[in-house]
Amino acid sequence: MGRPPPCAIQTWILLFLLMGAWAGLTRAQGSKILEGQECKPHSQPWQTALFQGERLVCGGVLVGDRWVLTAAHCKKDKYSVRLGDHSLQKRDEPEQEIQVARSIQHPCFNSSNPEDHSHDIMLIRLQNSANLGDKVKPIELANLCPKVGQKCIISGWGTVTSPQENFPNTLNCAEVKIYSQNKCERAYPGKITEGMVCAGSSNGADTCQGDSGGPLVCNGVLQGITTWGSDPCGKPEKPGVYTKICRYTNWIKKTMGKRD
């Protein structure tokens, strides 16, 4: 566990890309919580929001007092991280905003091809340490991979309707279940790697535009980072796709350890 999948891109994946087989199936850029509800305020104390000025870019997950985990495609030239937030319209008591000091994409992430979602994971080092407490605290990283059928929580400020977009002011949550790798591959033929995990529900609960980089939490442990899925979102037969944390634990810990 913890070893990332190989960086090499298989020839058949490249053929899919060249043929445009991904058209209409991805939503990673910016990538709600469909069929969810408002989270209990500060029940997800590891949830963060990435902002470029006043614009929400992505979600993120606090994994250390100076470290946030998110999707690699969320990287921007200059942006900040908000912690302890619930309502984006008003300042919450525990809310903190810290500038990003450094963005470290996984070395195998292909930033030149927006259709390639492999290794879509990134560590953000904050300029200053976060003030930790009950409403702002890091989450534990998965050492073991999630089990099929396991119930998990997804959260974010992304759109709550699709294809029309309607962004909420408050953090939304929904319950999903882990899909088998075979079921995931049947939903997205030729597009799923061992570094990805699918999760969804029969009622269409799903992440969507604006949720990229946010957490998939199972039994209080971080098992996934929101990356991509179907467009429109919320199709029961087309689950959300997440970067599988258990495959990257070693890289995460090694990268954080080098700079702490």
Curated annotation (Swiss-Prot):
Signal peptide: 1-28
InterPro entries: Peptidase_S1_PA, Peptidase_S1_PA_chymotrypsin, Peptidase_S1A, Trypsin_dom, TRYPSIN_HIS, TRYPSIN_SER
Tissues in which the UniProt entry reports expression: Restricted to hippocampus.
Top EC class for this record: hydrolase
Keywords linked to the UniProt accession: Cytoplasm, Disulfide bond, Glycoprotein, Hydrolase, Protease, Secreted, Serine protease, Signal, Zymogen
Catalytic activity line of the entry: Cleavage of amide substrates following the basic amino acids Arg or Lys at the P1 position, with a preference for Arg over Lys
Keyword Secreted on entry: yes
Active-site residues, as the UniProt record annotates them: 73, 120, 212
Positions of the pro-segment in this chain: 29-32
Keyword presence, Transmembrane helix: no
Annotated glycosylation sites: 110
GO BP: keratinocyte proliferation; memory; neuron projection morphogenesis; protein maturation; proteolysis; regulation of synapse organization; response to wounding; synapse organization
Compartments, record wording: Secreted; Cytoplasm
Every Peptidase S1 domain range: 33-257
Role played: Serine protease which is capable of degrading a number of proteins such as casein, fibrinogen, kininogen, fibronectin and collagen type IV. Also cleaves L1CAM in response to increased neural activity. Induces neurite outgrowth and fasciculation of cultured hippocampal neurons. Plays a role in the formation and maturation of orphan and small synaptic boutons in the Schaffer-collateral pathway, regulates Schaffer-collateral long-term potentiation in the hippocampus and is required for memory acquisition and synaptic plasticity. Involved in skin desquamation and keratinocyte proliferation.
Family the entry assigns: Belongs to the peptidase S1 family. Kallikrein subfamily.
Subunit structure: Interacts with SPINK9.
Protein name: Kallikrein-8
Species the sequence originates in: Rattus norvegicus (Rat)
Gene this chain is encoded by: Klk8
